[in-house]
Amino acid sequence: MSRSTRSVRLGPRDTLVERRRDGSTFLRSPHALGPYPQKLTQRLEHWAGAAPERVLFAQRNGDAWRTVTYAQALERARSVGQYLLQKKLSAERPLVVLSGNDIEHALLHLGAMYVGIPYAPISPAYSLLSTDFGKLRAIFELLTPGLAFVSDRKVFAKALNQITCDVIDKLEEPKPTSAVDEAHARVGADTIVKFLFTSGSTGTPKAVVNTQRMWCANQEMILGMLPFFAQEPPVLVDWAPWHHTAAGNHDLGLVLYNGGSYYIDEGKPMPGMIETTVRNLREIAPTWYFNVPKGFEALLPYLRSDAALRTNFFSKLQVLWFAGAALPQHVFDEMKELAYRTCGEEIPFLTGFGATETAPATLGRVWPAQNVANMGLPPPGVELKLVPFQNVLEMRVKGPHVTPGYWRQPELTAQAFDEEGFYRLGDAFLFEEEGLLFKGRIAEDFKLSTGTWVHVGALRARFIEHFAPLVRDVVIAGEGRSEVGAMVFLSATADAVELRARLASFPSTGSSNRIARAIVLEEPPSLDAGEMTDKGSINQRAVLRRRAALVEELYSESQRVLRCQ
């Protein structure tokens, strides 16, 4: 018996396909991209007029919520913009925010955007978790900021000793003058909204230029995939950090673009903090809910055991959306089952794919699929180029949502685009009728001594899924060797004995998919050494490089090596 699915208006999935003689494939939507504004503040002004009392931002304040309406946000953005103009900030001297998501951060962002001053949200990990502040110093050397904001000077004291620009910890909101209107009038499609940082395999920060055109065009692309936003303004309860494009562009943008409400969730998907998220979701019913796979996994025990939480969470929900990493199949299946048991119908569990350089949405799967690796197809306005690489396809992209390049790094910018102007994403896919299946990062893949290619991304995802919840993460080794090995970061409650007991059951279909040996890594991944990104994801190449001696031990007769029969 087929199950009913909650009725939600979703976009089309048809795609035009062109195949060239050189083996490359081009994909694009047959539907035209809808009109979009020159600057996102036009949407803020629209909603301040159309729904002035609607909540734009809310942040918990004890048992209540501190709120900012659309009318208040516009008024305060203009005042903040006046202050930033008085500080003589510019693209050469931008605003940086070192602390995380809060209402003050949001208003600084809006104020800077209103008067055309670029801002850069910096990962708090570079200030609070780092011990050498190397990435923070590198970012400041690249950007040369004119002003920095922190939510708490005491908490950020050590980091502030590393920087030289002016620092504020409270908003300054003078009365706006005609200078604000003049600056706003000069803002156009090519004006830089923000610099978002991403790290390559070297771990060196790159400042991705994000323009008004990129952000506005991408929001119209998202609306083409998820047109229900135009029928009902979205309500979000969101913890994801604004220094990442997923929340800072995708989520924040879809709220501003469509007149929604953004409830800032100060929880995180980790012990001791997930409870804050649960408390918020008991009170606020989202209509669109985004999380990373570990976030959904952390929520599951609470959704299983708390009927009141389940009822509120699923009551108004139109779409569940995951991104940022591979979603374990069991998490996908159980979230769908809980939704059905709670409200008698399935809720669309959708996903997409993008990058900091693409503002971010480049693919969207807005139809049901059993394979969680299916990232969907391009929305209107996006053109994809799929280039054969071994037995997968390297994806490249062109469209108004693509960055013009990396700030003050012309060599990296030139390397990022091919001869036809397509941005090189560096990700591997397979193209099937149901959509594009993500296979991992091409830079991580390697050959065994037999010449057989190992696709690391897919193998890592299968390994983590098979060994859940024992394994926190894994690094795949074996380049130039005869067999594949695994360097394992165990979860806090697991041990090597449990891992050994389950190694023999890991499924394989050949030498490139078979883990022949494994070793447990006792030292956690290092942020300062570039082994771990601020998102908590593992940099495969950095771990292999820094722990070369352990790679050698993995391929020795050491007693610590776990052999897979």
Predicted region positions:
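Conserved ATP-binding/catalytic segment of the ANL
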Residues: 393-448, 563-564
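Conserved pre-ATP/AMP-binding loop-to-beta segment of ANL
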Residues: 52-55, 176-197, 203-204, 228-235
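Conserved AMP-binding/adenylate-forming core of the ANL superfamily
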Residues: 32, 56-110, 127-134, 186, ...
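Conserved ATP-dependent adenylate/AMP-binding module captured primarily in the ANL superfamily
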Residues: 121, 125-150, 155-160, 176-177, ...
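Conserved AMP-binding A3 loop
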Residues: 66-71, 193-220
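Gly/Ser/Thr-rich phosphate-binding loop
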Residues: 258, 278, 287-290, 300-372, ...
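Conserved AMP-binding/adenylation subdomain of ANL enzymes
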Residues: 216-235, 243-311
